[in-house]
Amino acid sequence: MRISPYGAGSVTTTAIFCSLFFVTGFFLPQPGGAALSLAVLLFLFFTLFFYRDPEREIPTEPGAVIAPADGKIVLKQSIDHPVTGDGSTLVSIFMSPFNVHVNRIPISGRVLNLNYVPGKYLMAFDHRSMTDNERMEITLETAAGTIWFCQVSGFVARRIVCDLKPGQEVTTGNLFGMIKLGSRVDIVLPPSVKVSASVGMKTVGGTTILGWIY
């Protein structure tokens, strides 16, 4: 199982402490010691599962815009967005704690702007979280025009990781961060993108195609 680069330190630290407690369990009175060893082993497996980064086959079709996250589409609507303009399409992907947590670039381009916004920690399936919760807003200049997407913290997930920098050139499918313990990713596509995704669709980050430049 490949581990996300954003979790290497946490996995190493967890593995060391779990190893110590696992061995300690054999020297404690039983069955309490065995229960301790089993508990720390399960915790280690959960940590590995949480930080997993499975291989993904990135679509190579010209003009494809891919999902930036694993999850389920819970909202799709036409909006007038200050970055992408009137007639844009908002697609919201809800990430459960059991989904892969890493996030990927939806389409190649250049990072125009990063905007961290502190906020609340409403449940991610509450659509107010888009405007009220802590989030990282990202603007890309692409062949489709300017697109905007956002990592949103949730009630459980309170740690956003984003390693992008303004001016950075990025490629479709590249890792750029993660939202620990899930939450949601919102993406706003300009009118130049024909969005084929629909509410209820399950997405695989880096693989599922949300729409096409036309």
Swiss-Prot record:
Organism: Chlorobaculum parvum (strain DSM 263 / NCIMB 8327)
GO MF terms held by the record: phosphatidylserine decarboxylase activity
Residues under site feature: Cleavage (non-hydrolytic): G182, S183
Locations listed in the record: Cell membrane
Catalysed reaction, written as an equation: a 1,2-diacyl-sn-glycero-3-phospho-L-serine + H(+) = a 1,2-diacyl-sn-glycero-3-phosphoethanolamine + CO2
Gene name of this polypeptide: psd
Name listed for the protein in its UniProt record: Phosphatidylserine decarboxylase proenzyme
Entry GO terms, CC: plasma membrane
Family matches, as NCBIfam families: PRK05305.2-2, PRK05305.2-5
Transmembrane stretches, start-end: none
Assigned EC number: 4.1.1.65
Membrane topology of the entry: Peripheral membrane protein
Cofactor dependence: pyruvate
GO process annotations (BP): phosphatidylethanolamine biosynthetic process
